Amino acid sequence: MGVNKITHVAGTGPQPEAGQTVVIEYTGWLKDSSQADGKGAEFDSSIGRGDFVTQIGVGRLIRGWDEAVLKMKVGEKATLDISSDYGYGERGFHGHIPPNADLIFDVYLKGLQ
C-alpha cells in the first residue's frame, strides 16, 4: 500500500526538504473505484478558502502527504492516491473520513517559505 503520485504538470522549482514550509492548493476525495477518476465524495478543499501553508515531512500531516510532497517540485500539479494506512487509518477523521478509507488528492505545490 502507500501513496502513488501521478504528475499532471511537472514542476520546475525547487523540491522541499523535511521541515520546510510549503504552500499548497488541494482538494481531497474519498476514493471510489467505481468512478473513472477514482474520486468519490469530496471531503475538503483549500480552493476558495486560501492556500494551505504548513511544514512538510515532520509528522504534522498524514504519511501519504509527507512522502509525496517531499518528492514534488514547486509548480507541480499531481494526484495522490493514498491507501488508508498512509491516510487516517482505522480512526478515520470524525465526520469527514470513515475508518480505513482510501483517499485521492489533487495537489498543486505553489511555493516554499
From Swiss-Prot:
EC number: 5.2.1.8
Protein name: FK506-binding protein 1B
Family according to the record: Belongs to the FKBP-type PPIase family. FKBP1 subfamily.
Keyword Nucleotide-binding attributed: no
Transmembrane feature ranges: none
Source organism of this protein record: Neurospora crassa (strain ATCC 24698 / 74-OR23-1A / CBS 708.71 / DSM 1257 / FGSC 987)
Activity regulation field: Inhibited by both FK506 and rapamycin.
Domain (PPIase FKBP-type) ranges: 19-113
One Pfam family it belongs to: FKBP_C
Keyword Cytoplasm: yes
Superkingdom of origin organism: Eukaryota
Catalytic activity from the UniProt record: [protein]-peptidylproline (omega=180) = [protein]-peptidylproline (omega=0)
Main location: cytoplasm
Subcellular location field: Cytoplasm
